[in-house]
Amino acid sequence: MNLPHDGLAQPQRGWAILTIAIGLIMSVMDGAIANVALPTIARDLHASPAFSIWIVNGYQLAITISLLPLASLGEIVGYRRVYIAGLLLFTIASLFCVAANTLTLLTIARILQGFGAAGIMSVNMALVRHTYPRAMLGRGIGINAMVVAVSAAAGPTIAAGILAVGPWPYLFAINIPLGLVALVLGIKYLPHTRPAGHDFDWKSAVLSALTFGLGLAAIDSIGHGEDAAIALGEFGGAVIAGVLLVREQKHMASPLLPLDLLRIPIFALSIATSIASFCGQMLAFVALPFYLESRFGYSDVEIGLLITPWPIAVAFAAPLAGRLVEHYPAGLLGGIGLLLFALGLGALAMLPTHPSLFDVTWRMALAGAGFGLFQTPNNRTMIAAAPRERSGGASGMLGTARLLGQTIGAALVSLFIARFALDGARIALFAAVGFAIAGAIVSTLRLSQAGARGAEYVRVKEDQRMKGE
């Protein structure tokens, strides 16, 4: 087995990048397309809206509870094995989704899809780190960030297009050929990594699943206005499981919950920046369709087209940021990017009464460009701050931070709309501005002496490892 010490050589690197991108496109987009199809699926399968929401919730819950355990498993058995297993499960589950003729069967298939998606998401950044030479890591993460952002933003539009020409099973059928192609490429081209010398911690995996599963369920319950006793019980259970998890993990050398990485100042600050920014992003993503429809009367098709400049701007900004981070501090780039993001969101919240096409599109593009400028340097910092052998823990924590921020953002939109009716969408945009500014402030803290020391410590350790010291 040939282990890469500083990335893969071409053409293997190119094929590995394509494999990682296909898996990410499928897993991220499937989280977005189901929302659009929910009314159609519920009507076709004769299900109530309350029950049909589990098509979305089951997928998200499976990812939430398994991201960190699968990232830890990737360190133990090898990242490519976890990634390929995730691809295989995701593809098979997609076939089950196509064949499902009841809501119960479809929900079970979606939960299986979620576990497969977690296998893909949990180790994808670790694979990127082992695919690219260290000097090109920022560019690799830029491409990765572009794929994630564009897939998430374009998912609803693509779903609407598919539903316009075919039934809802087509949404899941498209994953089958893509998954098979990715499996063939992955087996041949993904990098091998050296397994860690410790066993999988089943007890911590269960506690982690309870902590994040119950925690995000509590946030969702609050957002949807469910009984306060239920939300309080879920939150209390999450706190108890979390305390037990930390006690179990705090003395471990390679903990499933990466406490060792969170002790590195620049890593912890990057995680906090990520949570705040993705909260702002999801506040905007969920609120914008309501805002544009209720306030300005745009149709669903028009809204999809008006939002398109956002992912296009991300597609340009994220790879550019990947090159800039090789020359400028991530804290500075992230701070500037999130301030631009905040300006774009604020400008959208203050659109004129009768906006022109240009009025909307330049604001969308500014928000997308700002987010793209932030995301790549932030992700690179999180991955590079971890010792190479802890890439899995960093990758899993990156995905968990993103999911946590998005869940909080979506719950807040529900809360604002329930409390303030149609004005809630505009209030949500102003809240998104606040989270973006908070993220910018935290990002610039990485320029402090403590943050610099954390980054320098990791660079020294990495240089020593590369030189065999």
What are the residue ranges of the model-derived segments?
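Intrinsic disorder in cytosolic terminal tails and internal cytosolic loops
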Residues: 1-12, 446-469
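Hydrophobic faces of alpha-helical transmembrane segments in multi-pass integral membrane proteins
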Residues: 22, 150, 154, 158, ...
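Residue-level signal for the membrane-embedded core of alpha-helical transmembrane segments
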Residues: 65, 119, 210-213, 283, ...
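Transmembrane helix-loop junctions and nearby membrane-interface residues
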Residues: 98-105, 187-190, 219-225, 246-250, ...
